[in-house]
């Protein structure tokens, strides 16, 4: 190390320090606008226009996104200092301070003893100050390094106010260490942003706002409250436990020690095979034992996945109530997230073995509970999602990619083995519970009411079980499976006061032993060619039909009870059902026949011979030119002309013509002769 140039040391430090932060930003793609995040989760055409998608976020998108990037750079700078010190052999066994951005960052280095409130007062007498009301104002950033523990707690009520103004804000970042917020039932801990200009929690996020984040390491929070924290992104959203998909810098120290020890035992490096001229043989490599195998290093606690426990805690007016990514073994119990400016509880990426129990999300601008892609083995038990701007609970188990991608992400479903049980979803503007993709999701013994729709499963989700739920007062459909769902089980549910009880569209499912009451259109309706079984359901209400399977050719039905169903068709539905193509055609033909018959009766007053108008031409002339002799026509000249002109015009009867000069009558034998007087 002594022979390394300063430039090389700096380059190594930057490289090592950059890895975890860059990875964190890669897994948490929240630097994009919240509206874009929401749009990826939900097709806008599927949203009620009155339902928010996060685009009504009240901050300054341009400035806040820049501040997120600035925070990433600040953390890189802090880690770079630690890396340089480590590589140059300098000792950083005591806390130190780094100038960065608009202020300073106090770095708590590794030690066996916890850092406490007293330590902060001693280390930062000018930036961690006790206020007249007994609270403490923190006006510089804190970073907890790997191997260090910060415990915030007291024997009495403890309030920590984190500086937030139009000029700057502060944060507490646990970088692979341990953060304890240790309150009790009688002495809780309260942490809030603090607008020093107005002496209130900071409401405006345009210029950023104080936040708490853990990158790897461990977080333990009990009997605490957090208010008005965070801005713009998930990792700066208030109370964030993100982890990273790469090891924290300090995690490689053990490996370095192992390498150094191995090298001391083997001071002479082996050489590669050479040819007769002393040149290395092409393809020759060093022996495999030059570097020791480092099995088990990935389990080092300094690695990126965060572990967290949050118990008996209230969170109010954060951008994100609780934000998790790259987390394992997370336990959230009796936590309330109220008035979050985006989502209440977010499990964003690579979260597994997590439980959220007895917790409540209410009045969130978007979703109450949001489980994004790439999660598995998550359980929501006895939770409440009330009056949220979009879905009560949203679960996205779709694949992260549909084909080859720059990151080589798997195309398999990621939202697997999620259980939602004994929970309540009420008053949410969009759906009570929405599931998109994923496998083996179980929804059991929940109560869902007063939403646009109750439970919606779509986007080729497989193996979804919807069992023993109570759904009521849904504006359209209580349970809907659609768009490629397979292996669905809808059993033992109770549905009341909905237009449609169960709706299936291109979804394969068994609908069995459900009870439907006060349904106003169809108890069960299906369309598409998927295999559907409908049996042993009890359906009551009124509408066109209790079970509508006319558009589902592969559906089977048996043992359904519909005796209390009243078949009714509203006027407009009758009109629509009447005006079918064939109905219109036959109606037009019938009208034509009726019109023709009536017109014929009006014109046909007397009985006439059918050929009355087809008389021979001879009946219309006085002379037959074929039978008249020239000498029988009488004298020619003016007299004859005058005689002819003076004759009365028109046809005369045969009796009048008989015996008149110049007239003819038929002779016997059919010949015509001239008759003269």
Question: Which residue stretches match the model-derived regions?
Answer:
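Secretory targeting and sorting signals
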Residues: 1-26, 589
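Short, glycine-/Ser/Thr-/acidic-enriched flexible segments
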Residues: 22-23, 400, 440, 509
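Beta-strand/loop edge motif enriched in small/polar residues
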Residues: 24-357, 361-429, 476, 574-587, ...
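Acidic, aromatic-lined catalytic clefts of primarily extracellular/periplasmic carbohydrate-active enzymes
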Residues: 437
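Membrane-proximal extracellular "stem/stalk" segments
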Residues: 445-451, 457-463, 467-576
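C-terminal capping region of solenoid repeat domains
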Residues: 555-556, 562-571, 580-601, 608-611, ...
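Cytoplasmic C-terminal tails of single-pass
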Residues: 603-677
